[in-house]
Amino acid sequence: GAARIAYPPDGAVLSFDPDIPRERQRLIFLADGGGQRPTWTLNGRPLPPDTVQAGWEIRPGRFTLCLFDSDGNRTDETSFSVRGVTPPP
């Protein structure tokens, strides 16, 4: 069957923790099914494969994550938000 987003779930509210170093706060996007390496977009922008594998460095805001198959068909979509204040780099 078509790949589906396993994490984060739709409607998830995540929190940025200012006591943890920024570079250690990463979100791993997970997919189930599909059999091939999917393509991801976050708020309409493609995510490079290395970002997906290493984890996306979280930042506050609202986000829409989409999953596409190898033919470019969207197979799933989820929305999530991140609360908190990001410290300066």
Where are these regions (language model features)?
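Soluble, non-transmembrane domains of envelope/secretory-pathway proteins that act on or interact
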Residues: G1-P89
